[in-house]
Amino acid sequence: MSYRQMLIHRCDIYHEAAQAPSAGRFGIPADRLQPVISYPDTPDEQDVPCYFTEKTQQLIQEEPDQTVYHSFLVHFPLSADIRVNDKIIWENHKYILKLPKRIRHHHWEVVAVRDESL
């Protein structure tokens, strides 16, 4: 079995876009404020081959409801364009990627995290 055949899942990748705030707030000039982070409506890459392995799952009781914290170790081919803080959508769930690690110039491994209220 080849490595490509192991990548049985497919996900969409959205690269983050940082934009400077349009106006200053609270007496702070706009060029001194943190950039506004957003993601495009259409994916930058579609149907990217990958493989998800569950690492941890926690259900935390918070006000007013529970929050699920879910992390996966995701494998991508070396040709995939993945970056820190990319948003991926897999099986209708949104995950944020942490720091990708290149493994022996062969593939990428990255932790994907989901935290949302139920």
From Swiss-Prot:
It comes from the Bacteria. Gene3D superfamilies: Protein of unknown function DUF3599 (2.40.10.370). InterPro entries: DUF3599, XkdH-like_sf. Pfam families: DUF3599. To B.subtilis YqbH. This is Phage-like element PBSX protein XkdH. It comes from Bacillus subtilis (strain 168). The gene is xkdH.
